[in-house]
């Protein structure tokens, strides 16, 4: 809650806070639009819910709108994707999927469904 108050204070009156994060279905690896498999991100969803709860409970911001869309991030190799995923909190790469990613012909894409929400600061 402290962080939300600081953000609120930093915004100009009526300023906008943008929040973008993945939403279900699970994130997956793809090659040429073909799925290699889904990541285990159940723990990540728990983190998202816990993180969003204070924003939804506060009277500092009013939700103005949201849009959902597909987000693709391209990697030059499967190894590069797997290395990047090591820093992702709450995401686990199943062993069989990691093998498929390593063997995949590059480029390898990370596919996510995301939501972008716009909140207006209340005064």
Annotated model-derived regions:
Residues 58-123:
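Conserved Class I S-adenosyl-L-methionine
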Residues 35-52, 67-75, 89-92:
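Acceptor-substrate binding/catalytic loop of class I
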Residues 1-2, 23:
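A short SAM/SAH-binding and catalytic strip from SAM-dependent methyltransferases
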């Amino acid at each position: 809650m402290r962080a939300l108050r600081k953000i609120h204070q930093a915004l100009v009156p009526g300023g906008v806070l943008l929040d973008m994060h993945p939403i279900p279905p699970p994130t997956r690896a793809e090659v040429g639009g073909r799925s290699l498999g889904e990541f285990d991100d159940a723990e990540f969803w728990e983190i998202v819910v816990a993180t969003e709860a204070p924003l939804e409970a506060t009277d500092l911001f009013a939700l103005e709108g949201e849009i959902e869309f597909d987000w693709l991030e391209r990697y030059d190799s499967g190894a590069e994707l797997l290395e990047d995923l090591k820093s992702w909190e709450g995401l686990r790469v199943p062993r069989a999927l990691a093998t498929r990613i390593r063997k995949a012909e590059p480029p390898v894409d990370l596919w996510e469904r995301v939501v972008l929400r716009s909140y207006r600061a209340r005064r």
